[in-house]
Amino acid sequence: MQRVTSYLPAGTPSSHPIAQVKLPHDLRHLRRKLLHLENGEMVMLDLKDPVLFANGDLLVRDDGELIEILAADEKLFEIRGRDRTHLVELAWHLGNRHLAAQIEEDRIVILRDHVIRAMLQGLGAVVLEIDEPFQPARGAYHSPGGHSHGHDHDHNHDHGHDHAHDHNHGHDHDHEHGYEHEHEHRHDRGHDHDHKHD
């Protein structure tokens, strides 16, 4: 079986890819995983560090051939505001709830959540159901080049004991669900302190 140990960011001048792998956004955070390609073949991804891949990134096989990563269509909400200021306000409300969001000039795209849709409509937003690839904005902990190295968790579900944890949160992750997870650790709960001064 061919192995992949390196990659090229989308837009890098290169030869034409010989195959493609289609993944939703939450399965594009990878380090080591057996990937099933669109042509029916398989390849073992084995990178040194976890990477959050974007649509169009290229995996480099050991023989030099390229495999293109494609963002799969997902069930999403398209959010539009009355104007840009209103859209910024809507983005603030979504960010305050730690939701993954794809923010564009005239719209915001999120995963479907009917509770959030009701909230947004209450704020005057127009919310439409769409099926498109999802490329949410990366958090502040990701590198400027758009790829995450060394800070996030790598969950390898093909090899349940190979975990790359760069910091200890006091719990183990050993899932058998056959997919990767991108975890954001939220530190806004359980830290509500009252400071009383005499």
Curated annotation (Swiss-Prot):
Primary location recorded for the protein, binned into one broad class: cytoplasm
MF (Gene Ontology): nickel cation binding; unfolded protein binding
The keyword Chaperone is assigned to this record: yes
UniProt cross-references to SUPFAM superfamilies, sorted A to Z: Urease metallochaperone UreE, C-terminal domain (SSF69737), Urease metallochaperone UreE, N-terminal domain (SSF69287)
GO biological process: protein folding; protein-containing complex assembly; urea metabolic process
Superkingdom, taxonomy of origin: Bacteria
Task of the protein: Involved in urease metallocenter assembly. Binds nickel. Probably functions as a nickel donor during metallocenter assembly.
Region (Disordered): 137-198
The name this protein goes by in its record: Urease accessory protein UreE
Keywords: Chaperone, Cytoplasm, Nickel
InterPro entries the UniProt entry points to: UreE (IPR012406), UreE_C_dom (IPR007864), UreE_N (IPR004029), UreE_N_sf (IPR036118)
Similarity-based family: Belongs to the UreE family.
Basic and acidic residues composition bias: residue spans: 149-198
Intracellular or extracellular location(s): Cytoplasm
